[in-house]
């Protein structure tokens, strides 16, 4: 088991780890269930957060509460795990066997010791018995790595889609975790989890003064200017706030357009820490030039700021206008992976086309990135060669 960080009271309340009441799963489906599952993609929501933040509490709440949602929950545990894991995971011949159990409120649950990919593949055999999938990561995991598997596994992608990333932050210890300095300039895990989130739950707000919650909220906003922040106690949250987010698909186009107009730029809360920058550039970009701009940032990693530090982009989101396309295009990026997808929203003939981008990362320089994007739209090669250092690739 991975060692806990901090004092013992950071850990989850043992009572909250108890296994929910289980009933045997039915192996047959009704015709209605089978029909409802055919041809429909299932949304997957990633639940992440530092050790003791309240991930298990949230999942136990979902698994036991009466909420009319049919949710499949995949618990990702390391080492000995909790009573919940011991009840759900069976090891045979040294290999893990996933046992899916149906709970009294209609939800499904299993526990795995790997990245959850195999569990999801097995779960799809029960398609029609659930409407949503929640995938928990370990406390020290980088959710970006888990996110990427939904983009690179084409076969799996035919059945599911990534709906969003939920990060839970402990009110009592969150500020300590987010400001912890790592050796060699590495980004600490808690900060990276917040940077990638679409929804941030500040949990256990009843355990600290209101002033401490405000400080934590300010720090979170300084890291991620795009995600929605919610305050909770004992991880109790309206499921409508964490499900059906459509944070990674074209259905978010309309709401994203409004949201990007109000995303604040942020200042780092520590030297060389993660910030959010946003800018708007009018015009149309050729798709090949847009790809080159993104690939230099995410793949080649050869873009540097005024201090000659490498820019590291953790999350990229935006709406762009591509030449010869009548639809607005949403761009999404997580670490090295990115995607361009047309939205249902068309550009109006009487309005100027524009591009709005939000980037979350480290050592980001808004002026340089905006200049590079202007060069992308106007096809000005000089601006590109000034800041793309092909012989000085960042590692």
Curated annotation (Swiss-Prot):
This is Zinc-regulated GTPase metalloprotein activator 1E. One of its GO terms (molecular function) is GTP binding. The gene is ZNG1E. It catalyses: GTP + H2O = GDP + phosphate + H(+). A motif (CXCC motif) lies at residues 107-110. Residues 8-20 have a biased composition (Acidic residues). Belongs to the SIMIBI class G3E GTPase family. ZNG1 subfamily. Pfam families: cobW (PF02492), CobW_C (PF07683). SUPFAM superfamilies: Hypothetical protein YjiA, C-terminal domain, P-loop containing nucleoside triphosphate hydrolases. Signal peptide: none annotated.
